[in-house]
Amino acid sequence: MAAVELEWIPETLYNTAISAVVDNYIRSRRDIRSLPENIQFDVYYKLYQQGRLCQLGSEFCELEVFAKVLRALDKRHLLHHCFQALMDHGVKVASVLAYSFSRRCSYIAESDAAVKEKAIQVGFVLGGFLSDAGWYSDAEKVFLSCLQLCTLHDEMLHWFRAVECCVRLLHVRNGNCKYHLGEETFKLAQTYMDKLSKHGQQANRAALYGELCALLFAKSHYDEAYKWCVEAMKEITSGLPVKVVVDVLRQASKACVVKREFKKAEQLIKHAVYLARDHFGSKHPKYSDTLLDYGFYLLNVDNICQSVAIYQAALDIRQSVFGGKNIHVATAHEDLAYSSYVHQYSSGKFDNALFHAERAIGIITHILPEDHLLLASSKRVKALILEEIAIDCHNKETEQRLLQEAHDLHLSSLQLAKKAFGEFNVQTAKHYGNLGRLYQSMRKFKEAEEMHIKAIQIKEQLLGQEDYEVALSVGHLASLYNYDMNQYENAEKLYLRSIAIGKKLFGEGYSGLEYDYRGLIKLYNSTGNYEKVFEYHNVLSNWNRLRDRQYSVTDALEDVNSSPQSTEEVVQSFLMSQNVEGPSC
């Protein structure tokens, strides 16, 4: 008789045993807690797979149980799945654990140092997990409790612990946009480092300086951010955790991008991507972090198509790890929305960009307060997309509705930015510039002019006369003067200035030049200068040929499969370039 193919595959003996334990969960609940952490986790994961989230939630909300589960390090990816499912289900497990840990710390305030040290270690692991999972407020509560324990003993071990606490605290405050608290956290860390120095001890400063760089970058203090990234790079040594090295390389790359030091930025971020994938694997959240920053680099060097692909890869990883309504997923959606908007700007096909922008806003509004700063950038991106959809819309009523929605989003973003950063800030200036463009679309030309001039003035004072951001605003004001206010002489000067900056920073094939060239062709047609019309038609044709050749083959992910240099060589190359150039600020 011929062999018949099995219609089911038998479970392994181990999986059968796990299933049997789960089937008898109510009776064996207490016994489960005495199992080794890996086996205990597998039981809980089976509960998750069977959709028994209430029972799983009751287990994970107990600090002792969850602390033990956290020790199953090779299951972290799966733990994120379970945890996010509970949060999506409405089980506030992050808040419950943070509160339980905080209470425990208050109970043991009078206990001996060994008890406190054990609690601090638990806090670091718990807070680290909550931070990695994006639950920053709860992680902050945990790290503050750890810091409080550290201050109870004025001795060297606890000074080291306090420094580590401050670094972690600064990271979660940066992630949660609590920038006003960030600087005091850094100063506290420096106080403990000074104490250690006086006793002949040194704590590595790479992670601390890297987090300070992230804080300053978020506040658009780019010169200061760059300076501290250089200091962080000096602190990279062979014994540092790979995670710290990767994060410092990422921050340094971003600082180089905004300083328009693209060669340095490329070397740093490509090595960070390679290092993260090599050490953590291609499905790890840390790898997705590096991809987002790689996408940022590619977008800024005008390799927009590859930027979209990289952002999509980062989103795919974050969705596979976290899924659901998670802040890490939201930020990836937002980055992909903006790059898709830029990529499809000429075609006018904004469905994909709008989808990702709305997903980002939907997630953020679900898990964070409605006045959270993270909403400012997501709303800004959606507003930009709606404006372009409105411009292409043939129904006047729909056009007005979309423009008004975009206006409300831009105003909301501007208020959030001003509240966080004040008037004199690059982020605030960007929002003024966006409003200027919108007012032009709404045919409110004087208001548009006022907004553009305000944006240019702030950007010039903060970034200098020849920055990319300045060129953008100058080009937008030129467009207003050319298309709607008939101020051709002013428009011509501004177009030529915008073109000069774009060529200097990005070369002859820069994508943004198209709009300036087309603007000049229209301008010279309007003024009857047909010789110039012919000249710029030729310039535009040459530009199109350059664009066809640019970035036609390169696969950005293939480009980082290996690294031609070691980490030490990358760091030394960067630092040597600083010595050659001298101080940057």
From Swiss-Prot:
Q: Which UniProt keywords apply?
A: Cytoplasm, Cytoskeleton, Membrane, Microtubule, Nucleus, Protein transport, Repeat, TPR repeat, Transport, Ubl conjugation pathway
Lineage, top-rank taxon, reads Eukaryota
Q: Does the keyword rRNA processing apply?
A: no
Q: Where in the cell is it found?
A: Nucleus; Cytoplasm, Cytoskeleton; Membrane
**Activity regulation per the record?**
E3 ubiquitin-protein ligase activity of the CRL2(APPBP2) complex is inhibited by APP.
What InterPro entries does the record point to?
A: APPBP2, TPR-like_helical_dom_sf, TPR_rpt
User: Which molecular function GO terms apply here?
Assistant: ubiquitin-like ligase-substrate adaptor activity
What positions belong to coiled-coil segments?
none
What is its membrane topology? Peripheral membrane protein
Extract one GO cellular component term from the record: Cul2-RING ubiquitin ligase complex
Which biological process terms from the Gene Ontology are attached to this UniProt entry? Answer: intracellular protein transport; intracellular transport; proteasome-mediated ubiquitin-dependent protein catabolic process; protein ubiquitination
Q: How is it modified after translation?
A: Rapidly degraded by the proteasome upon overexpression of a C-terminal fragment of APP.
- Identify the pathway: Protein modification; protein ubiquitination
Pfam families in the record: TPR_10, TPR_12
Cross-referenced SUPFAM superfamilies? TPR-like (SSF48452)
Q: Where are the TPR repeats?
A: 50-83, 120-153, 206-239, 288-321, 333-367, 429-462, 471-505, 514-547
**Functional note:** Substrate-recognition component of a Cul2-RING (CRL2) E3 ubiquitin-protein ligase complex of the DesCEND (destruction via C-end degrons) pathway, which recognizes a C-degron located at the extreme C terminus of target proteins, leading to their ubiquitination and degradation. The C-degron recognized by the DesCEND pathway is usually a motif of less than ten residues and can be present in full-length proteins, truncated proteins or proteolytically cleaved forms.
User: How is the subunit organization of this protein annotated in UniProt?
Assistant: Component of a CRL2 E3 ubiquitin-protein ligase complex, also named ECS (Elongin BC-CUL2/5-SOCS-box protein) complex, composed of CUL2, Elongin BC (ELOB and ELOC), RBX1 and substrate-specific adapter APPBP2. Interacts with APP; APP interaction inhibits the E3 ubiquitin-protein ligase activity of the CRL2(APPBP2) complex.
Protein name, entry field: Amyloid protein-binding protein 2
Q: What is the lineage of its organism?
A: Eukaryota, Metazoa, Chordata, Craniata, Vertebrata
Gene name per UniProt: Appbp2
